[in-house]
Curated annotation (Swiss-Prot):
One of its GO terms (biological process) is positive regulation of cytokinesis. The gene is TAS2R13. Gene3D superfamilies: Rhodopsin 7-helix transmembrane proteins. Most taste cells may be activated by a limited number of bitter compounds; individual taste cells can discriminate among bitter stimuli. Disulfide bonds: none annotated. Receptor that may play a role in the perception of bitterness and is gustducin-linked. May play a role in sensing the chemical composition of the gastrointestinal content. The activity of this receptor may stimulate alpha gustducin, mediate PLC-beta-2 activation and lead to the gating of TRPM5. Residues 29-55, 107-128, 206-232, 283-303 are cytoplasmic. It is a multi-pass membrane protein. It is found in: Membrane. It comes from Pan paniscus. This is Taste receptor type 2 member 13. The lineage of its organism: Eukaryota, Metazoa, Chordata, Craniata, Vertebrata. Belongs to the G-protein coupled receptor T2R family. Pfam families: TAS2R. PANTHER family: TASTE RECEPTOR TYPE 2, TASTE RECEPTOR TYPE 2 MEMBER 13. Glycans are attached at residues 162, 166.
Length: 303
């Protein structure tokens, strides 16, 4: 049974790869069509396009890394190839996490209602705020790349001094764990920011519901529905990201202790986030949901 597990996990990874490319490709396609037809696009739709593209890149990185790890081929990659592979992973993962976090901030500034002058100032300049945050995250990306490059250089120097198979395999595993740990630490910041956005949205919704109960008893309020939909999107991101974060954390621990089964399981769970969360974004967006249902109806009618 254990010998069949790599094949089973590989099939799951491939399924996640297909779902992820279809869902993220759908987001890009529909928004680009809308952009061409209307000659304009909202800020949230632009964020979704960039987020979907970054996730497509991340999904491809996950697939390539999976097969390299499965067949122990990563150690044979050249220094330049190793840098390209790891840097591509870092860049796609960086924008994947930060753009989803920025989306949470966007919903907070657009939907939440606070009387704080600072919040009102940011709310009036939401597009500039989003752009400044996006540019500011490049500092984290730059620092992450510098740290990883130092780890790569250190490992390559040791590898050139001692090229025996046993040393190379054990040292590469230690190097891989160090890379994962560094990436995990840099991933904590966007998760924390998204979590704070979620708490502020909850607080804003609670205040709004209390106000509605006092002043508008018996009436349905569309703003409450907007709050709820935004919370669903942010909660789904937090839950998927938490599973992604924990899977990475457990996978580098299992890799350190050479537990192959746990490592493969965690890698499979981690790939679920960029593949499936985009599908929830489609269902949570009125335009994308309508287009998806239309396509699904046409496909079903042809059967």
């Amino acid at each position: 049974m254990e010998s069949a597990l790599p094949s089973i996990f590989t099939l799951v990874i491939i399924a996640e790869f297909i779902i992820g490319n279809l869902s993220n490709g759908f987001i890009v396609l529909i928004n680009c069509i809308d952009w061409v037809s209307k000659r304009e696009l909202s800020s949230v739709d632009k964020l979704l396009i960039i987020l979907a593209i970054s996730r497509i890149g991340l999904i491809w990185e996950i697939l390539v890394s999976w097969f390299l790890a499965l067949h122990s081929l990563a150690i044979f990659v050249s220094g330049t190839g190793l840098r390209i592979m790891i840097f591509s992973w870092i860049v796609s993962n960086h924008f994947n996490l930060w753009l989803a976090t920025i989306l949470s901030i966007f919903y907070l500034l657009k939907i939440a209602s606070f009387s704080s002058p600072a919040f009102l100032y940011l709310k009036r300049r939401v597009n500039k705020v989003i752009l400044m945050i996006l540019l500011g995250t490049l500092v984290f990306l730059f620092l992450n790349l510098i740290q990883i490059n130092m780890l790569i250089k250190d490992w390559l120097d040791r590898y050139e001094r001692n090229t025996t198979w046993n040393f190379s395999m054990s040292d590469f595993e230690t190097f891989s764990v160090s890379v994962r740990f560094t990436m995990t630490m840099f991933s904590l910041t966007p998760f924390t920011v998204a979590f704070i956005s979620f708490l502020l949205l909850v607080f804003s919704l609670q205040k709004h519901l209390q106000k509605m109960q006092l002043n508008y008893k018996g009436h349905r309020d569309p703003r409450t529905k907007v709050h709820t939909n935004a919370l669903k999107i942010v909660i789904s991101f937090l839950l998927f990201y938490a599973s992604f974060f924990l899977s990475i954390l457990i996978s580098w621990i299992s890799e350190l202790y050479q537990n192959t089964v746990i490592y493969m399981l965690c890698e499979t769970i981690g790939a679920f986030y960029p593949s499936s969360h985009s599908f929830l974004l489609i269902l949570g967006n009125a335009k994308l949901r309508q287009a998806f249902l239309l396509v699904a109806a046409k496909v079903w009618a042809k059967r």
